Design a protein with these regions (language model features):
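Extracellular mucin-like PTS segments
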Residues: 143, 259, 277-331
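Long, compositionally biased, intrinsically disordered segments
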Residues: 1-288
């Protein structure tokens, strides 16, 4: 499975600040809020500050993406990290969406199980209540000029689905790795330069279990080969990408391996900075795929009572482009 981002370019002139809202429906049938069923609407709000920074250049908003849906086993607390990147190296914080314009029918706390936590470092802790439950997660990513700032420079929504599944008989999930040693590394790349990425999925379960897919959430101009079994335990795909001029700025690629028991691997992500003239340096980094307990503070908690029902839609998120005066609304 490969999910491609689509973009709408909006030319903003003679404005210092603007808000872009995309609202429609419907989500697929959801388990929460109680009784929502197939009536869930979505709304995504992106705020854009067009005033010059102290460096006399426009702000570059953060980029964030998520593979959707994410499968989690019932009754087991799960940690899900939302990969983010900010080309200005601003402080990036995450929170739950909290207004009708930001989340429509799926605003927390009623849209998620009790005890769900969203930490400012973009770490989500969630425990699925019932097998076959579907939840829509509505998160807002914001960048701040420094750690003391309270007003964000921009607001970027990320919305994705979670599906609760029966526990697998095998206690191990697949491991997905790539060319970088960890997902907090950034790669500079020049427009027109071909770049190959081999993703390798390892199976730790009995031989009856296989890796059936390596799913990718990618940008344009990227190709993917069919999945290949290399050994009894290893499968791989090869990605090839030649960035175009329209991709100048920050890009994030994410992937997940899925085995024949429908168990998902870790989400593996790579971040890129694209430039026209030369290979650029990387001023920002994406959130690491390991959790530092010392950073899990001042979280958003879900403490309301809940019930259940059924299922949601596709990955929906909004980003604004980088290094230009145009902003791109990606859904």
């Amino acid at each position: 499975m490969t999910v491609i981002q689509s973009s709408t370019v909006i030319d903003v002139q003679n404005a210092s600040y603007c808000i872009v809202i995309y609202a429609s429906g419907n989500w697929r049938s959801l388990s929460l809020p109680n009784g929502i069923g197939i009536l869930g609407r979505w709304s995504l709000l992106c705020s854009i500050d067009l005033e010059l920074r102290p460096s006399d250049r426009h702000n570059t908003p953060p980029v964030a993406i998520m593979i959707s849906p994410r499968f989690i086993p019932v009754g087991i607390s799960q940690t899900i990290i939302v990969p983010t990147m900010d080309a200005d190296n601003d402080q990036v914080r995450c929170r739950f969406a909290n207004t009708t314009a930001e989340c429509a029918s799926v605003c927390p706390p009623n849209s998620l199980p009790i005890g769900t936590i969203m930490f400012p470092n973009c770490t989500l802790l969630i425990t699925g209540s019932n097998v076959a439950d579907w939840y829509a997660v509505a998160i807002v990513i914001e960048d701040f000029i420094d750690s003391t700032a309270s007003l964000p420079l921009s607001t970027i929504p990320v919305q994705f689905l979670i599906n609760v599944q029966q526990k697998s008989s095998c206690p191990y999930r697949p491991l997905l790795t790539g060319p970088t040693t960890s997902s907090d590394q950034c790669i500079g790349i020049k427009v027109g330069t071909s770049f190959n990425i081999e993703l390798i999925a390892e199976n730790f379960c009995p031989n009856s279990t296989i890796i059936k897919d390596i799913a990718i959430l990618s940008f344009r101009f990227l190709t993917k080969t069919p999945i290949v079994q290399n050994t009894t335990a290893l499968w791989s795909v090869l990605l090839t990408w030649t960035p175009a001029a329209v991709q100048v700025g920050s890009q994030i690629l994410c992937a997940i391996a899925i085995d024949s028991d429908n168990v998902q691997s870790n989400q593996y992500c790579m971040s890129f900075i694209v430039a026209v003239e030369r290979v650029p340096s990387c001023p920002g980094q994406i959130i690491p795929t390991t959790v530092d307990p010392t950073t899990l503070t001042t979280a958003d908690y879900i403490t309301s009572t809940i019930a259940d029902s059924t299922t949601p839609t596709t990955v929906d998120y909004t980003t604004a482009s980088e290094y230009t005066d145009e902003y791109v609304l990606s859904i």
